[in-house]
Amino acid sequence: MNWMEVSIVINHEVQEFVTSILEENESNGVVIEDSKDLDGELADKFGEIYELDPNDYPDTGVRVKAYFNEIDYSEELKNQLLRNIQELAELDKNIFDYNEQIIKESDWENEWKNYFHPFKASKNFTIVPSWETYQKESDSELCIELDPGMAFGTGDHPTTSMCLNAIEQYVKPSDSVIDVGTGSGILSIACHLLGVRHIKAVDLDELAVRVAKENFEKNSCENAIETTTGNLLKGETNKYDVVIANILAHIIEEMIEDAYNTLNEEGRFITSGIIIEKSDEIIEHMKRVGFNIISINHDNGWACIVGEKVSN
């Protein structure tokens, strides 16, 4: 199977809107190449891990790369993307650019290696590519070895980072956890590293499930995590202390009631993948169902919301 890489150069003001448009049109992952990164702005957050190649970045603005299954990428989809992006009021059409290229699946692993290096994703979690060696900086540092494959979820997106921080704060070793839309399995691995022993990872995409299983093996937790294909929480009969979902807002809307019903009393629903503009709608829906909102965090235009199931 081949993949269509869509490369779009835009101004910073519309970055989050364009990313959301691509994800809502079911892209299989997004890469951000920000011209500001060449100024060293990431150094304070992630440390001096590697040097950036200026040739990989636009002269100005942001290059957003999205990946679609070649079979699914049609002229109709292209026109819809162009129409939605060009309708953005703040779009600077002087720098706007839209390009496409086919990437063979056999080349995908090497393509990702150009972007993926060790970095600190949260207070205690560091993400380490499976093809690189890394020396822990302290005993408290928890390293997740990862090969994103085609499932993405490398931890460098603000939503994943916020979920990792929420997991550190709200997940206990004694908890049972279900990770909905597990992708590369990063959030399930994080729970395992914190001592959780009852974890279920679910994804609708069979490829994502395969990649997640491979990453569980890399982190020696394949026997501790139940992995399965499934459509959100539909058909789930077990109860859990924590439901985690880092997926798009309109999908989260569909599963809020199921998340509430799947949780034990005082269980926690950790959810992200929500642009700030849609966060109030999600929060109100969660409250109507019966959740007590215990945490709301924002990062770069995205929100992470944690709700607790109120005892009846």
Swiss-Prot record:
GO terms for molecular function: protein-lysine N-methyltransferase activity. It is found in: Cytoplasm. Its EC number is 2.1.1.-. It catalyses: L-lysyl-[protein] + 3 S-adenosyl-L-methionine = N(6),N(6),N(6)-trimethyl-L-lysyl-[protein] + 3 S-adenosyl-L-homocysteine + 3 H(+). It comes from the Bacteria. GO terms for biological process: methylation. S-adenosyl-L-methionine binds at T160, G181, D203, N246. Keywords: Cytoplasm, Methyltransferase, S-adenosyl-L-methionine, Transferase. CDD domains: AdoMet_MTases. GO terms for cellular component: cytoplasm. InterPro entries: Ribosomal_L11_MeTrfase_PrmA, Ribosomal_PrmA_MeTrfase, SAM-dependent_MTases_sf. Pfam families: PrmA. Belongs to the methyltransferase superfamily. PrmA family. Methylates ribosomal protein L11. This is Ribosomal protein L11 methyltransferase. It comes from Staphylococcus carnosus (strain TM300). The lineage of its organism: Bacteria, Bacillati, Bacillota, Bacilli, Bacillales.
